[in-house]
Amino acid sequence: GKLADPDQLGNGEDAQAIIRETPAVAWMAYGIHGDELSSTDAALWVAYQLAAGQDEASRRIRENVVVCVDPLQNPDGRERALTLTRMFIGQVANPDMQSAHHTGTWPWGRGNHYFFDLNRDFFILSQPETRARVSALREWNPQLAVDSHEMEPWETYLFSPSREPLNPYLSPSYHKWIRIFAEDQARAFDRHGWSYYTREWLDNWYPGYTDWIAYAGAIMILYEQAGVAGTVVRRHDGVVWFHPFFPSL
């Protein structure tokens, strides 16, 4: 916490010493909308890879970064979404997005126990999950934060930075590093031939989103994966997508 509070720093040399001797902190958050099921599923793979991966990248992360994985930010919403899916799925999953097991009934799984959208609460702090999460984030003061979501199945993959106009209340350093991360991620997607887009509908003006942490100095990356509503969907182009774990729902 000393580096995050300038009042505790004596001079620039103190800050540089902390930077050299202290590992970076990354905060990986998943499942703030309970009906975006693949987000939490991905968190388990990320945690396993970081803990057990023997590749060079995983080893370097373990040696140099403290990674905090928050795998399920909205457990009540996820349980409600899974209950609706089990209720309406039938013997054979229907890929039509208008079928009942995709649309469900109110209250859907997006909100928490009180049906509140937790991804709108980060300056209001009206919900217990948000208050606990903000307390933990202020304790760890991550340099990198990731928020993972799902979007409609006919989309591809979205990641930061946001569309213009850019938020002038975020530091020039933030805008610089978010571009560096985006360019690196774009190259990785290009190597695999994966479709993606960026600088589109995403904005980072509203301080109630998870990316409020950018105001505290973190580089905040949003990931939006095309979803399959927990089971199987037929896209507009006729492609059928499956959730890899839906038979176990």
Pin down the residues of each PLM region.
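Metal-centered catalytic cores of metalloenzymes
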Residues: 127-129, 193, 227
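Metal-associated gating/positioning segment near the N- to mid-region
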Residues: 34-48
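Second-shell loop/turn segments in exported
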Residues: 29-36, 119-123, 171-175
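Surface-exposed loop and adjacent secondary-structure segments within mature catalytic domains
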Residues: 1-6, 13-23, 42-46, 59-125, ...
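Short HxH-centered metal-ligating active-site micro-motif
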Residues: 17-38
